[in-house]
Amino acid sequence: MGLEISYSNGFVLDKNLEVKLNKAFEVISAEEDLSQYSINIRIVNDKEMMDLNRKFRKKDSSTNVLSFTNNDISKSMTGNLGDIAINHDFVKRESIEQGKTFDDHIIHMLIHGIYHIPVSYTHLRAHETRED
């Protein structure tokens, strides 16, 4: 299956970056046995992310990434695991602050978002994994 990428407010990622995002999903899909599934990715701006964060998390602020699991019965028929919103404005600022390239950081946000969907990944699990 794969990633379905959509955009808000006219912002569009470079095609090479889209290829990298799809490759990252392919690698995770192979490792986590998710190749029969898809995930929707929406690239948003600060305003749209703030609206999503307010609506779903009751937080009046923007953030870099949000994940939404598809708990609908249609998941078994569509193979869609859920949605990830990635805030290009926030990621751009963070990449500069952290001395990373935009491409590397947005790929990191995709990976982070994916692990919050299908495998009930938590920050605690990430910490435990790093210590192994």
Residue ranges and their predicted role:
Residues H112:
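Nucleotide phosphate-binding/pyrophosphate-handling subdomain across enzymes
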